[in-house]
Amino acid sequence: MAINILVVDDLAFIKIVLRDILEKSGFRVVGEASNGEEAIRLYQEKRPDVVLMDITMPGMDGLTALKRIREFDPAARVIICSALGQQRLIVQAIQLGARDFIVKPFQPQRVVSALKKVLNII
């Protein structure tokens, strides 16, 4: 059974990099969003196993989307993707219910280990 992932980032390049890492590691990308509003809509529509979500995006940011997704589904598994130097935002995301975080630029093994951690596949 494939594990379904929703990728949320406003940069097309980041979505391409994540899709490549995920698909090469046996995960299935079931949707891609460019902002928080799209992320919420796709989460409700696709019900992915995990969301990989950027913090800083135009329109609704990742923290607000995380909060709304967790209100809709308290069991939602969200991993925050952040740039170096965003420690305060990472702490805020964890307090809002993010299960883990990964830092850009992505290391494929870190992406996979974060997914396995939140899915309890170790």
Model-found features: residue ranges?
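Two-component/phosphorelay signaling modules centered on CheY-like receiver
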Residues: A12-G31
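Acidic catalytic/metal-coordinating carboxylates
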Residues: N35-E38, D61-T64
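Active-site beta3 strand of CheY-like receiver
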Residues: K46-L52
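Receiver (REC) domain active-site loop signature in two-component systems and cognate sites
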Residues: M57
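Short, conserved "switch-loop" micro-motifs in signal-transduction and mechanochemical regulators
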Residues: L84-G85
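C-terminal output helix
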Residues: R88, F106-L115
